[in-house]
Amino acid sequence: MGAGGCISVSETKPNQKNSLERAPYDKPPFTISDLKKAIPPHLFKRSLIRSLSYVASDLTVAFLLYHATTYFHHLPQPFTALAWLAYWVAQGCVLTGVWVIGHECGHHGLSEYRGVDDTVGYILHSSLLVPYFSWKYSHRRHHSNTGSLDRDEVFVPKPRSKISWYSKYFNNPVGRIGVLFITLTLGWPLYLTFNVSGRPYDRFACHYSPNSPIYNNRERFQIYLSDIGIVITSLVLLRAAMVKGLVWLICVYGVPLMITNGFLVLVTYLQHTHPSLPHYDNSEWEWLKGALVTVDRDFGVLNTVFHHATDGHIVHHLFPTIPHYNAMEATKAVKPLMGEYYQYDATPFYVAMWREAKECLFVDRDEGEKGGVFWYKNKM
């Protein structure tokens, strides 16, 4: 039985429990209904005006950052290069916030009007080359099966028996750097296109294919709509490249998008990968236990930029329609009831990224155990 980590390891005090201690895996003494009752009812309310104000704010900042690039050529070197570097990082972070709001639309968390949510989400995600409905449906299955080794959709850890023979050659600092680089730069498009790191299917799975086994017959038409959104955005980008040049497009749009993709992969990875978290096979998995297989993280000022997708993720898994601007208050409301089932780690995200890449290579039962509870391990 582990404790909810209230602080990072480096900040642990004698009277507080270590965030690397294992989370509890027994059936929680509370129900989802108990948790819902602990949250003030007004926090479930979704205001269209307030939600759109965040959309407008993010898009305004993104435009101002873009507008600033039109003055970079007036700067002497090396300040031009530094200005572009600052732009890439800042714009990548802002667009991650835009991506998060699009994700919230997919959960019907923007407003009380599902059609409005899907329209806004479709526009925002398509502009970032994300197939909106395609990912919405696969992500919904992730929420329905979190923590399940058999049915979860993404970042499903492999049991020891299924790790590749060559994995041991990457279990070193150089190998980890290579794996992290590929994961952060190519992980998102590889997942969408080839289902890399996703749940295994009996045939080819792809977010762009209406015939993918990820989707049922009722969903296939909207996969076509998602693809149309990607095609329209691609044509706009092609036209921009023809008018402004390919280098301009890469600098203004391509590099920030890569940073956005890297952040969304990193955030998702750290939300569900932690030495303290269990995973379950079918004999042990229950929805509430699985929903608790996640950890809130501290990304510093980026918590706000990313609309609390980082430090409000547990309550998001429990109640995904709660709007992001109420997530922290809702988290505060459920923490006393959750007790040690609430997992939080304030380790800086770049430190946690390296630690998890080193410690969380596969999952296995504890020695001598035969149950359905699996823990992260790294000894091959």
UniProtKB/Swiss-Prot annotation:
The places in or outside the cell where this protein is found are:
Membrane
Q: Name one GO molecular function term.
A: oxidoreductase activity
Per UniProt, the short sequence motif Histidine box-3 occupies residue numbers 313-317
| Positions with biased composition (Polar residues) | 9-18
Region Disordered: list its residue ranges: 1-25
Q: Keywords on this record? A: Fatty acid biosynthesis, Fatty acid metabolism, Lipid biosynthesis, Lipid metabolism, Membrane, Oxidoreductase, Transmembrane, Transmembrane helix
Q: What is its main location?
A: membrane
TM spans (from-to): 52-72, 81-101, 177-197, 223-243, 247-267
Which cysteine pairs are covalently linked by disulfides here?
none
The answer, when asked if Zinc is one of the entry's keywords, is: no
**Motif placement: Histidine box-2:** 139-143
| Enzyme Commission code(s) on record | 1.14.19.34
| Pfam family membership, one | FA_desaturase
Instruction: Indicate which residues form the motif Histidine box-1.
Output: 103-107
Q: Which GO terms describe its cellular component?
A: membrane
How does it sit in the bilayer?
Multi-pass membrane protein
**Top-level division of the source organism's lineage:** Eukaryota
Q: Does the keyword Transmembrane apply?
A: yes
**A Gene Ontology BP annotation from the UniProt entry:** fatty acid biosynthetic process
Known role: Involved in the biosynthesis of dimorphecolic acid (9-OH-18:2(10E,12E)). Converts oleic acid (18:1(9Z)) into 18:2(9Z,12E) and probably palmitoleic acid (16:1(9Z)) into 16:2(9Z,12E). Very limited ability to catalyze (Z)-delta(12) desaturation.
Regarding protein family, the annotation reads: Belongs to the fatty acid desaturase type 1 family.
This chain belongs to the protein called: Acyl-lipid (9+3)-(E)-desaturase
